[in-house]
């Protein structure tokens, strides 16, 4: 196969199977054969399906996601799912660090993760019983970010994370501006959960309350916050915007689940503990 040097390097670094005992994929076709055989194992006629899968891969008609190519048929204890949204983070220290541990183990096995940090009380809010003030969701995002920097996800790639925060959270301005510091939260993609009520307030040039736990912490102009988000996106490409009410309205399972986050790249909204198995269909070779 005639392929570009960069393609060869990516295959060799990220998807080629090699183990300390010396077993390895000799070439790309060996990778396709390994993946096809592994995916065909559950079928009633594995040999027939392995051939069909291998033909699709060899012709680049369909490519499964990277975790499938890297992990299928290797015998390693890794996930074949690329992306997850983790469970809700409780607003207490035990739940926060239980979620950090869960995220670390998920990324160690190859999964990218999404988290909604809107459940954490804002910076300066009192913490009853300990005589202290909360440090806010961004301080704990720094903990996730440091953890992610130390995790080599499934052997050959760094972890990937998405952080979301509601547009009415009292720390939303700090969230929007967080990446003005080029060294901060580099392992995160970040998105604001924008509601229909907020967009209406922007259109009406109305006031917008920043609230948590039923208490209004501050009030600002909705249009000022919207323009702040747009300036940040223009200047350093983040945060993104997720129209979360529309996402939930169009979810076929809206009657039994609530979506508040997406996978790391943002293309797949998921409920808590939801997972997505990704793949690419190459229409260029399927359509004449």
For the regions a language model picked out, list residue spans one by one.
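Extended catalytic cores of very large enzyme megasubunits
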Residues: 1-288
